[in-house]
């Protein structure tokens, strides 16, 4: 009879037991002496065993399996103080095994745990939507794993205590890729970077930066390059580090060559260059490191010319009319090609001013602009030469007379089609006039490599008469010689 009563369902009701008395078997409710814990569920031999719910006074609770008084097996736990929840396997009161942890701040973790910490393989999504899948240790990303960041970047490789360290590959959202060594979450050690602009760097990295990165553009050759009028010439360029070593680890930067003519308004400097600009075509002069300003001048690149490149005068003459400054200013590349000058808009045809050959990609720190020459002055740019006799008149003008001195158009070549004595027409000149010019090589890599472009470099150029390295001289007593 007593055995039958033990099987009566009514005997399993919690009302038969006082909350202050620990139940022995079956279902019961028990409030612990410190009143912080309350248990509702199955008992066996005076211990929580089977399915039950343990409630905490702060609002936290666990519901699931118990074994011999301990939270062990499958269950669900809610922490009131953090708002986090866990559903999965437990061992001795701690999440252990496989489970899902959801965070109140956002995100969740699904995978293996040990003593409540992420341990082993798992999948973690944080509150920003960033996703990591791989190995964990001591609650941190550790070992092999891959992560997709909120900006779209993706990393696959080694981790050490939540930081990328070891060997890994980073696929950037902009198309750039880095493959190599990492330390403390940045590029460090041997690696290769393929930038979205087409620039590549293969070599050592230190604290996230290339150790042998190019810092400046250098044009090889004499300080003053002298070229015979109408002759093509070649310009060799190097990208150099701060110590002057060639940046051989770097390739792919896009360099653009452009030209300027010396801008002179004073009569005493007219022999080096003087161009009178129409108001409609006047451009803002650009300061050069040679002590004078220049204005943009057309430059052409071609592969077919009659003269040999050997006509370039290799020896540089000293004693320039204006002293050369030691400092080299940084020129914004936008000054010559405007905003939005990207590779996609480069012309494909050659033998034209500003053609695609005026753009060269660097290969292992070096580039060459082959068969380049200066063309004829553009419309609105008229070359003039002051005569010595006129300089005397200019010096004898009344004080305060600000009117420009008399000038004559130069007779180096016809400016436009003119009639010869035999009735034929002389074609306009296709070569630059004698005088001083400036070549400029600028970095137009787009987008800029690692957010920066190299400063523009300048090369001093002098155009000389064919067969004579001296500029024409007009005696004072024969002003009509050039008329």
Swiss-Prot record:
The keyword Repeat applies. MORN repeats lie at residues 39-61, 62-84, 86-108, 109-131, 132-154, 155-177, 178-200. Disulfide bonds: none annotated. It comes from the Eukaryota. It holds the Pfam family MORN. Residues 394-404 have a biased composition (Basic and acidic residues). Keywords: Phosphoprotein, Repeat. Residues 392-427 are annotated as: Disordered. Residues 418-427 have a biased composition (Polar residues). This is MORN repeat-containing protein 1. It comes from Rattus norvegicus.
